[in-house]
């Protein structure tokens, strides 16, 4: 078990890469903090981890919320006493995306079927506010999670 005794905080842990990472890290011995904006999905990941004998807890976290990120770090420290690993898997590919909302994603893509024939149209027609929302989640979310968690990681060595 390569992560025995380590504490891993994983944003976007409710599905996709975040969920897979949480499950794998737990199998490797880590205690896992699953953070996600969709509570039900985050709780499902915790259930998957604990059913396999791992240790996990859930905390609600909107990746672009400074206060949510600090609450996430505080939760990890309260629950497990340290933060050793941070994985920022929270991310989206389009502004209409909401983690776990497959129906909304399908509707979003259905409106853009014609773009798949000429992908340049998506770029040329992309609304700047939509682009900024995607970048905020994907990039700002990583920065905010690091700002919240890295001080504890440095402190614990």
Task: Name every feature range the model reports, one short phrase each.
Residues 2-33:
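Canonical Rossmann dinucleotide-binding motif of NAD(H)/NADP(H)-dependent dehydrogenases/reductases
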Residues 6, 54-55, 82-83, 104-119, ...:
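Active-site loop of short-chain dehydrogenase/reductase
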Residues 11-12, 83-91, 99, 107-117, ...:
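Rossmann-fold scaffold of SDR-type NAD(P)-dependent oxidoreductases
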Residues 28-44:
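Conserved glycine-rich Rossmann-like NAD(P)H-binding loop of the short-chain dehydrogenase/reductase
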Residues 39-40, 60-72, 128:
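The beta1-alpha1 cofactor-binding region of Rossmann-like NAD(H)/NADP(H)-dependent oxidoreductases
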Residues 52-55, 75-86, 94, 119-127:
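A glycine-rich helix->loop->beta "capping" turn
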Residues 103-143:
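Catalytic Tyr-X3-Lys loop
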Residues 146-147:
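A short, exposed helix-loop element centered on a Lys and neighboring polar residues
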């Amino acid at each position: 078990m390569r992560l025995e005794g380590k504490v891993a905080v994983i944003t976007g842990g409710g599905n996709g890469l975040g969920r897979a990472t949480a499950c794998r890290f737990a199998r490797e011995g880590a205690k896992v903090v699953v953070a996600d904006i969709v509570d039900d999905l985050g709780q499902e990941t915790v259930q998957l981890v604990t059913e396999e004998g791992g240790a996990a807890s859930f905390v609600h976290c909107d990746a672009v919320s400074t206060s949510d990120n600090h609450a996430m770090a505080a939760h990890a420290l309260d629950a497990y006493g340290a933060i050793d690993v941070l994985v920022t898997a929270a991310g989206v590919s389009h502004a209409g995306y909401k983690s776990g909302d497959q129906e909304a994603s399908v509707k979003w893509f259905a409106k853009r079927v014609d773009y798949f024939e000429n992908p340049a149209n998506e770029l040329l027609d992309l609304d700047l506010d939509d682009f900024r929302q995607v970048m905020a989640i994907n990039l700002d979310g990583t920065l905010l999670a690091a700002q919240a968690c890295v001080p504890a990681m440095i402190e614990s060595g």
